[in-house]
């Protein structure tokens, strides 16, 4: 197992299980255009009454764990966390990066400047000429 500090970077949408996975990181960063969507567990169940009852019991335990985990990570109360997991329409809350930071889910919002972070050149980068070629091909 990795023993050093970890940083999670949300580059798009961290919803559902992705919103849970990033909680394990020591520091969470999100690009300004990223979204964060925590919600209660979802499933499709099939079977007899006993199967459905077992599934419901498992989901209730999972939901209690989600409440505790998000509350612990954010410093919010369990009641506030429950309101985020329910959301305005019963399907969780869709946060912008800034809203997620204000709610304690994200530690830092990365502003988009047109350059890669720290001015580094990404691996597998595409040349400007290649991008222009694709743009011409796609706009014909």
PLM regions and their residue ranges:
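N-terminal organellar transit peptides
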Residues: 1-20, 24-140
């Amino acid at each position: 197992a990795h023993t050093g500090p970890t940083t999670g970077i949300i580059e798009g949408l961290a919803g559902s299980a992705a919103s849970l996975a990033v909680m394990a990181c020591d520091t969470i960063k999100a690009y300004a255009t990223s979204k964060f969507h925590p919600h209660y567990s979802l499933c499709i169940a099939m079977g007899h009454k006993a199967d459905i009852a077992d599934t419901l019991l498992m989901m209730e335990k999972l939901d209690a764990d989600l409440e505790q985990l998000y509350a612990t990570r954010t410093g919010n109360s369990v009641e506030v966390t429950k309101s985020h997991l329910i959301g305005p329409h019963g399907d969780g809350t869709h946060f912008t990066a800034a809203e997620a930071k204000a709610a304690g889910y994200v530690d830092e919002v990365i502003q988009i400047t047109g350059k890669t972070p720290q001015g580094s050149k990404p691996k597998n980068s595409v040349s400007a000429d290649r991008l222009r070629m694709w743009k011409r091909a796609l706009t014909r």
